[in-house]
Amino acid sequence: MSKITFYIGEESYTFNAAIEIKLDGETKPNNLRVETILSEEISRYINNNNLKGKPKHISIEDESFIGECKDLSVIGKLEIRTK
């Protein structure tokens, strides 16, 4: 389970999602996989809650890793590090 946080304007939104940042068998997290799933989860959250605007200052966190990016408009910008 991972905690996802993002901002639309000055408003912060946080929710939990069943995303594993590093899967069993991976030597390190696959940024592209995590970024793709993160984008899908945030889009679903925005649609389900009728939010307007683009998510900014996005973070994903689990018990071992933290991933951060300013936005998801450009693929490959998610930076993941260990806690």
What are the language-model segments listed below?
Residues 28-69:
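Acidic, low-complexity, intrinsically disordered interaction modules
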Residues 19-21, 64, 82:
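Domain-level marker for long, solvent-exposed, non-transmembrane regions
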Residues 72-82:
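C-terminal edge-of-domain segments
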